[in-house]
Structure formats: structure tokens, C-alpha cells
Curated annotation (Swiss-Prot):
Pathways per UniProt: Pyrimidine metabolism; UMP biosynthesis via de novo pathway; UMP from orotate: step 1/2
Record protein name field: Orotate phosphoribosyltransferase
MF terms in GO: magnesium ion binding; orotate phosphoribosyltransferase activity
Top-level taxon of the source organism: Bacteria
Lineage: Bacteria, Bacillati, Bacillota, Bacilli, Lactobacillales
Cofactor(s) listed in the protein's UniProt record: Mg(2+)
Family matches, as HAMAP family: PyrE
Function in brief: Catalyzes the transfer of a ribosyl phosphate group from 5-phosphoribose 1-diphosphate to orotate, leading to the formation of orotidine monophosphate (OMP).
Binding site for 5-phospho-alpha-D-ribose 1-diphosphate: 97, 101, 103, 123-131
PANTHER family: OROTATE PHOSPHORIBOSYLTRANSFERASE, URIDINE 5'-MONOPHOSPHATE SYNTHASE
E.C. code: 2.4.2.10
Family: Belongs to the purine/pyrimidine phosphoribosyltransferase family. PyrE subfamily.
Organism: Lactiplantibacillus plantarum (strain ATCC BAA-793 / NCIMB 8826 / WCFS1) (Lactobacillus plantarum)
NCBIfam families reported for this sequence: pyrE
InterPro entries noted in UniProt: OPRT, Or_phspho_trans_dom, PRibTrfase_dom, PRTase-like
Length: 212
């Protein structure tokens, strides 16, 4: 487990941005039963946590994508973190809506993006990647050259891996579901039986918790 992955996992559990409830699961809008609920918007209210996030993402971009010219935040939860990362890297910032505005100029992208500029897109959470990939299409249509998509946390689902591979876009996250449940067990947030159930969910989220 990398130091930053463990730090972010601990942060998310401590501020209750992530709740684990394998014995009393949540129901997603899609109808899927889930033992985890994530609200990374809470991170903006904790200066130390948001600094860990901004510095962690900035370090990855400097190391892996040094040619990056623009940071793009995905509306709305990705915007504040993208702004802090852009500030650390002294790079331009844009943000991208899931769809164009239905009034005014009808823009989907706010800020200045020049054709050919190299972009790293940032969001708070990756489940299957559907919303951020829609935003990525808008950036590409505007001439942006997307280097990667980054996030604070990923559920590390096979569906996301497949979707990003199909889009030919690299994906990185500071922490992920396997790392988080490992940290949760070490800190006694969950017991061994709950850990086993949490592992099972990630292997087959659509059928986990479904009884005949």
C-alpha cells in the first residue's frame, strides 16, 4: 500500500466521507445494493485533508504527466480540487459540465482551452467512469489532448477499467476501494466477516446482496 493511498483512505474514513455498511447496505440510483457510500464533497471543509489531496495529485501529474498544460475540473465536485492543483502547479484551470448549459451561451466548458493543449481532468470519485468520460468527450471535441483522468478515490470496479480502456484514457486515483477496506480493517472500523463481504461486493457488485 502506498503512503498516499493509506493517508487518503484514513482521511476519508476519519471525516466520514466514506461510510461502510456491509450489514445494512445502501441502494444506488441504479438499484445496485452497495456496502459503501462516498461523499467526497466533505473533503473541502477540512484544510489538512484537501492539502493531502492537492499535493498528492500534483505530485502524480508532475511525475507522470509533466507536459500537462491545463487542469480541468469536472463539475461540480471536481472543481475545487482542480483549482487547488492548478494553483500548486501554476497552470490554467477550466471546468467541464456533464452537458452544455441550457441558457446563456450554452457552454459546456468554462475557461480558456486552446486546441492541442494537454489536459489532465480531475473528479472526486470514479465508479464506472460514465460521467467523467462524457465530460472528457467535450474536452476532446474542443481540441483538448487529454493526458489522463485523475480522482481522489475509485471503487476500482472492472466496469471502470473497461470503460477507460475503451476510451483510451489513462486513469489514476489517490486511493481506492481495496486500499480503503484494508485500512478500515487495520483501524477496526470493520471486522473480518465484514471485510470478506466487502471484498465480495467488488467482485460482483450487481449481484451482491441479492437474495432469491
Amino acid at each position: 500500500m502506498s503512503e498516499i493511498a493509506a493517508t487518503i483512505a484514513t482521511d476519508l474514513l476519519t471525516i466520514k466521507a466514506v461510510t461502510l455498511r456491509p450489514n445494512d447496505p445502501f441502494t444506488w440510483a441504479s438499484g445496485i445494493k452497495s456496502p459503501i457510500y462516498t461523499d467526497n464533497r466533505l473533503t473541502i471543509s477540512y484544510p489538512a485533508v484537501r492539502q493531502h489531496i492537492a499535493h498528492g495529485i500534483a505530485a502524480i501529474i508532475k511525475r507522470e504527466y509533466p507536459a500537462t498544460e491545463v487542469i480541468a475540473g469536472v463539475a461540480t465536485a471536481g472543481i475545487p480540487h482542480a483549482a487547488w492543483v492548478a494553483e500548486l502547479l501554476n497552470l490554467p484551470l477550466i471546468y467541464v459540465r456533464a452537458k452544455p448549459k441550457d441558457h446563456g451561451a450554452g457552454r459546456q466548458i468554462e475557461g480558456v482551452l486552446k486546441p492541442g493543449q494537454k489536459v489532465v481532468m480531475l473528479d472526486d470519485l470514479i465508479s464506472t467512469g460514465g460521467s467523467v468520460l462524457q465530460a472528457a468527450k467535450a474536452v476532446q471535441a474542443a481540441g483538448g489532448d487529454i493526458q489522463a483522468v485523475g480522482a481522489i478515490f475509485s471503487y476500482a470496479l472492472d466496469a471502470a477499467t473497461q470503460n477507460f480502456a475503451a476510451a483510451s484514457l489513462p486513469l489514476f486515483s489517490l486511493s481506492n476501494y481495496p486500499e480503503l477496506i484494508k485500512v478500515a480493517r487495520q483501524a477496526d472500523y470493520i471486522d473480518d466477516e465484514e471485510l470478506a463481504s466487502l471484498h465480495t461486493w467488488r467482485q460482483d457488485p450487481e449481484h451482491w446482496g441479492v437474495t432469491d
